Amino acid sequence: MNQQYSAMRSNVSMLGKLLGDTIKEALGEEILDKVESIRKLSKSSRAGNEVQRQKLLLTLQNLSNDELLPVARAFNQFLNLTNVAEQYHSISPHGEAASNPVALAKLIERLKDKNFTNQQLKQAVEQISIELVLTAHPTEIARRTLIHKLVEVNTCLSQLDHDDLADYERTNIMRRLRQLVAQSWHTDEIRKIRPTPIDEAKWGFAVVENSLWEGVPAFLREFNEQLEESIDYNLPVEASPIRFTSWMGGDRDGNPNVTAEITRHALLLSRWKAADLFLNDIQVLVSELSMTESTPELRELAGGADVAEPYREIAKQLRTRLQVTRDYLEQRIKGQQSLPPEGLLIDNSALWEPLYACYQSLHQCGMRIIANGQLLDTLRRIRCFGLQLVRLDIRQESTNHTEALSELTQYLELGDYASWSEEQKQTFLLTELNSKRPLIPTHWQPSEATKEVFETCRVIAESPKDSIASYVISMAKVPSDVLAVKLLLKEAGADIRLPVAPLFETLEDLNNAESVMTRLFDIPWYRDLIDNKQMVMIGYSDSAKDAGVMAASWAQYRAQDALIKLCEKSGVTLTLFHGRGGTIGRGGAPAHAALLSQPPGSLKGGLRVTEQGEMIRFKFGLPQVTISSLAHYAGAILEANLLPPPEPKTAWIEVMDALSDVSCEMYRGYVRGEKDFVPYFRAATPEGELGKLPLGSRPAKRRPTGGVETLRAIPWIFAWTQNRLMLPAWLGAGAALQHEIDNGKQAVLDDMCENWPFFNTRIAMLEMVYAKADLWLAEYYDQRLVEENLWPLGAKLRQQLSDDIKSVLAISKDEHLMADLPWVAESIALRNVYTDPLNVLQAELLQRSRTHSESDPRIEQALMVTIAGIAAGMRNTG
């Protein structure tokens, strides 16, 4: 165990020393001494030395305005480098995640031990479907420029791990590391301007190019080797167990910056990047496929019997077509309208078929080893990414559709659609969906907002098939919300069979999800249309903000379970789409635990889940990390489908119902019922200041005024993470558990913890939150920033947190938090030494900026750096 971490710790101290050298060179010995003294005080403070803690507070309070920024930056950079060392450790020969792909092989052995036949395992493998949806919010807080440097630091750490390095090689690698650390130090870590949705889309494409492009075929190769070895099975070349979709440039819910034109632009960029990446692949194949022997069919395809190198000839033809495609898309991106040229690649089959013919011919001519090299990787990329690179989801809030149709029906003098009953709406929508004539008059001039809704549907209609993955309706409440989108698509000339996924996200909507879908399935026209396939999205963040984490997670479980049973009864294949974030308050949990804690049967229709902002970098930032993450997902799906978790016992359900009610009542009692809560929240956290951070393209609020309910879920969680109270991720949960213990339910809770992955994961997640929360820091924020009349509320919340930790330990039977996950505990402990000074500094900066009438750019800049640094320290933003 300790040896496992010693490699990581030595990398952390080496990178820390390089950073120290850089700071000394840039700012002199004095600043470095100050930083080093703060780090040592922080370490002693963490070890419980109260005298040193007071000294730490005084040192940071007495920094001059000129010293603030260098000190904040030093600790922020320490944390970035620590995260790199940790990410590298997870894939290094020393790290436990080095065994992830091996873990997959072990799982297959475990399944065989449980008497699953090779045939059953083969069927389960064939059903694996992983669709990861890349989203920008809460958006990666680190700049793309810095991320590239940190990725290269990772590469250097990997090179240093080779035992057989010559001295000069080691010297060169260390020199490069020094350069990268210095470059990072001299690069501004905070963006000066807010990214546009197109910037975000490009960030997504960069992840594909830098990591997924290599990582996906590499994972499939490893997975295939394990399957071959363990169950004598090869993944079919045409299998596409992994797909990527993006919300960047398609998610317009609450983001007025995402227009139809932006979506059109993002789709073109995506196709351009795909053509560019495939062109590189084909270029390699042109040089590799010099073989002459082929089947007669392939020779015919290459241009006849006279062609000496048929494989190369086919690759060259594709190269020409990809160049034509890339050039055409480049013109379109620049706004030049031109007719589609001859040879333009639109359909994946035009790229797939010639290359697959090469693959078959090589196999038939005894050149399997060549076929299974670069060519197989390219074929797998066509299946995973295709000519679209990533498909796009469109997301819009239901009220926008209602208002657009309302404007139309009033113009047509049919009445006001928005004021009709649900029955009237359905009658109107179904009549129009079955009508042969268009509904929209040619010369109608709607309002800008309505025009935008219709124009978005036109973009869908004009895009190549397979460019758009689904249309997600947020705040879906009734069947007409789904039918309305179908009608809008029909009127735009789009394919109305495009999956339309209602998103159920508040507590009430989750509780009503089954009834809404039942009514939808009862409509014969709808049942005929969907071909027995339905996608439903479950929202995690808004329900947690609405009702607290315990009530929300139970409502999510109940909704999923009810939908699974409804679809089984109705003969519909259900794909549940999980809108999770990286934080607990937004449904975050390690992938394996999260998937196994879902209701039985929830993964039969495949896994579709959002991967957000900074989590994309942690899980998919490097090809090796991608292999590891995909192995996690594949293993969890196999396990969940073959060894499903148990159906909850009646006693468990009763306890969960009680936990949900008690926790929701307590959560809402504070958040909505406590008159001082909102002023306390605004004073004790940097919520107001967060709005200034040029983070994502999306505004932080749905409406510019109002209380907690108008805040987006992400800033709400982000703000509480900053002051280390982590309130949204625990409030109500521990108190509800204690309530049930007091009601004599300890034995039932023990049974649930032991035998029910759903409950066990809830407890583990609470432990992780408690391990990251910090009472003394939260209290320090109160003392520096909150008016004295609000102190009792803060004290009450901290006491609640303290009591809750005891309640959870009574259930987990552990002596201390995270006893089962020493790796995570180690990781939190390692970062706390660097995060604590940033928290103290942030409270100091907030106090200075709020008491000074004029803004000081030094204070503002340092404040932004502490926000970024604490986010890196907590390893999640929102």
From Swiss-Prot:
Q: Which residues form the active site?
A: 137, 545
Keyword Membrane assigned to the entry: answer is no
**How is this protein annotated for GO cellular component?**
cytosol
Q: Which cofactor does it need?
A: Mg(2+)
Give yes or no: UniProt keyword Magnesium. yes
- Which PROSITE patterns does the record match to this protein? PEPCASE_1 (PS00781), PEPCASE_2 (PS00393)
Q: Which reaction does it catalyse?
A: oxaloacetate + phosphate = phosphoenolpyruvate + hydrogencarbonate
**Alphabetic keyword roster:** Carbon dioxide fixation, Lyase, Magnesium
Q: What class of enzyme is it?
A: lyase
What GO MF annotations does this protein's record show? magnesium ion binding; phosphoenolpyruvate carboxylase activity
Domain of life where this protein originates: Bacteria
SUPFAM superfamilies of this UniProt entry?
Answer: Phosphoenolpyruvate/pyruvate domain
Q: Which PANTHER family match?
A: PHOSPHOENOLPYRUVATE CARBOXYLASE
Name the HAMAP family on file.
PEPcase_type1 (MF_00595)
Q: Per its database record, what is this protein's job?
A: Forms oxaloacetate, a four-carbon dicarboxylic acid source for the tricarboxylic acid cycle.
Give the record's family classification. Answer: Belongs to the PEPCase type 1 family.
What protein does this entry describe?
Phosphoenolpyruvate carboxylase
Write down the species. Answer: Proteus mirabilis (strain HI4320)
Taxonomic path: Bacteria, Pseudomonadati, Pseudomonadota, Gammaproteobacteria, Enterobacterales
